[in-house]
A protein has these predicted regions:
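Hydrophobic alpha-helical segments within soluble ligand-binding/sensing domains
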Residues: 173-175, 180-210, 220, 253-261, ...
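Flexible loop/turn connectors
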Residues: 262-369
Length: 369
């Protein structure tokens, strides 16, 4: 199986040779699914290396498929060229690296430079890192700040007073700050949860439970989408278990996961949506060690698709469009910086997709319907 970087090089080589290539040709040449090709093409287009056209791709306007600095633009308006963009991310390990890459590629395509600082889901640390970037002289900020907990509201109010444009990434102001005028790029996590539930129902399940990580800021949105879909489809209320678990590998995790599986067995739950990947992998591990067949006796859909394909069996997963999310956030920031007139607040939400593998007993790939 080719690595993503190898596929990208082959795609660029084919486009440089022929000038334009149809997506169906790429699927045949690469030996992967259309979904995978579309992801690869989107990433290359976000980096300014290709231009998407109906049914295919061509070289970008930059010669030879290399990014042309200073000429980037988006549906949000012209992009400020040569900008120094700051970004504060809550992690540089799970989920966020792809978001960061998407933002960095977009800034580079506009001839700018991105400066990154990592935080730790803590409002005080967020503020320290943002202050350092402001002292560095950044002209605009991408931030994924804490929105709950001690100091979060004060942090968000402070962000709203800064003289440089701020774009929230995977964050929205809480209900306490309904008029905070900050642009934002987010994922429709509630919709993603609904995709997972509807997929399990399409396979014959009439009861779908939910398992969420206690540490994830996305769990409330995933839970809201799960609840809404379970109610709208009139699924078995007795099987609609709403459970949370500690982080996979943390102290005492195995005993808690075993207890959860026992509760599912007693309630007759045979399908679960699990947020996030590591928790889903841990749950499958404990299930199989306990003699529960996956997917034969328990179907599992994971949420995040960071390491889901490495599970045994590979996990069907809801996949947020992380690279595109970072790119869109950067586009918003650069457009805001370039527009000297009064422009309205932009809040953009991207739909995730569903990647179907083996953990539910189906092997086709699909997207939102």
């Amino acid at each position: 199986m080719m690595l993503a970087s190898e596929r990208h090089q082959l795609i660029l080589s084919m486009v440089r040779e022929h000038g334009a290539v149809r997506l169906t040709e790429l699927v045949e040449r690469l030996g992967v699914t259309a979904v995978t090709v579309r992801r690869d093409v989107t990433e290359l287009a976000d980096r300014g290396l290709l231009t998407r056209v109906h049914g295919g791709v061509t070289l970008s306007r930059a010669r030879g498929g290399h990014p042309e600095p200073g000429r980037a633009a988006s549906v949000f308006g012209p992009a400020a060229p040569g900008a120094l963009v700051g970004m504060v991310a809550p992690s540089v390990e799970y989920y966020w690296p792809t978001v960061i890459q998407g933002a960095q590629s977009t800034v580079a395509a506009a001839g700018g430079r991105m400066v990154l600082r990592a935080s730790s889901y803590d409002a005080a640390q967020d503020r320290r890192q943002i202050t350092k970037l402001l002292e560095r002289g950044v002209q605009t900020l991408l931030a994924a700040p804490a929105t709950t907990g001690r100091g979060a509201l004060d942090l968000l109010r402070w962000l709203g007073t800064l003289s440089v444009p701020v774009v929230l990434v995977e964050r929205l102001p809480p209900p306490e700050l309904p008029t905070l005028a900050l642009d934002a790029a987010t994922t429709a996590h509630a919709l993603g949860a609904g995709l997972a539930v509807r997929h399990l129902v399409s396979l014959g399940h009439r009861g779908v439970g939910l398992v969420t990580s206690r540490s994830s800021p996305h769990s409330p949105a995933v839970r809201a989408g799960w609840r809404e879909t379970v109610a709208s489809l009139d699924l078995d209320a007795g099987a609609a278990l709403d459970l949370d678990v500690p982080v996979y590998g943390s102290h005492g995790w195995a005993a808690e996961y075993d207890a959860l599986l026992d509760r599912c067995r007693r309630a007759g739950v045979r399908a679960l949506l699990v947020h996030a990947d590591w928790e889903a992998i841990g749950l499958i591990e404990r299930a199989r060690d306990g003699g529960i067949a996956v997917p034969g006796e328990l179907a599992v859909v994971s949420y995040d698709d960071e390491v889901a394909s490495a599970s045994d069996p590979p996990l069907t997963a809801v996949c947020p469009q992380k690279h595109r999310l970072g790119a869109v956030a950067a586009e918003l920031a650069l457009a805001r910086l370039a527009d000297t007139t009064e422009r309205p607040v932009h809040r953009l939400q991207l739909w995730p997709t569903l990647v179907v593998r083996e953990s539910c007993g189906s092997t086709a790939e699909t997207g939102p319907a």
